[in-house]
Amino acid sequence: MGIKVYKPTTNGRRNMTSLDFAEITTSTPEKSLLVALKSKAGRNNNGRITVRHQGGGHKRFYRLVDFKRNKDGVEAIVKTIEYDPNRSANIALVHYTDGVKAYIIAPKGLEVGQRIVSGPEADIKVGNALPLANIPVGTVVHNIELKPGRGGELVRAAGASAQVLGQEGKYVLVRLQSGEVRMILGTCRATVGTVGNEQHGLVNLGKAGRSRWKGIRPTVRGSVMNPNDHPHGGGEGKAPVGRKAPSTPWGKPALGLKTRNKKAKSDKLIVRRRNQK
């Protein structure tokens, strides 16, 4: 999918870019796979803001995407490649030979009319899903499970990919997009290929209104707030932070503080950390 560059006919159009949606084959989703999605605007059940900078935006329907890929041995034909407003990747509508319809994350190179299948005996072909233990070393994969049968949880964003590095007993070594090398059970499934729509991160929204269409509200710097709103607030004019280190609106250390649980049980499965040289 290419990038479309606009002429600076207005201030909002200057530097604006968008995807050309050349891969999208239909604008009408499969009705049986849609679910109503109520906007929460970052609020919890008490109506309090628990996630800032969310609210507004265009109304969406949630597309039921099959992350499990557990219909073994049943072939499916790719019918459409569609836009999904709920994720950065595109999705593909597939029709199984037994009549079932499903959405999957559309990998790079997947085309309408292509046949895909899942299961331990599946070929190493883009769009096919199989256990990690059955995938050769060096293969690029996405939509990786962390627990067998729970569905893919890792490597689902546009342009993301991971690589199978080897096998150690019942575990398979996988290098993730971040550079982290992790051991994952060989019975966990993954889909062959890279997630499509890899140009997604290069889009320049161009104007504030386009962020609002996506349901993203403005992010205000703490230094321009009042002291009762943020620890960085107050002072005369453009005042510095005034503290030993930057902090969150709730006074906790920000920018660089490690937030991972030091007793996380999954530590033993991480062979190489993402920031390790």
From Swiss-Prot:
Coiled coil: none annotated. GO terms for cellular component: large ribosomal subunit. GO terms for molecular function: rRNA binding; structural constituent of ribosome; transferase activity. The keyword RNA-binding applies. SMART domains: Ribosomal_L2, Ribosomal_L2_C. SUPFAM superfamilies: Nucleic acid-binding proteins, Translation proteins SH3-like domain. Residues 219-277 are annotated as: Disordered. The keyword Zinc does not apply. Gene3D superfamilies: 2.30.30.30, Nucleic acid-binding proteins, Ribosomal protein L2, domain 3. Part of the 50S ribosomal subunit. Forms a bridge to the 30S subunit in the 70S ribosome. One of the primary rRNA binding proteins. Required for association of the 30S and 50S subunits to form the 70S ribosome, for tRNA binding and peptide bond formation. It has been suggested to have peptidyltransferase activity; this is somewhat controversial. Makes several contacts with the 16S rRNA in the 70S ribosome. This is Large ribosomal subunit protein uL2. It comes from Streptococcus suis (strain 05ZYH33). The gene is rplB.
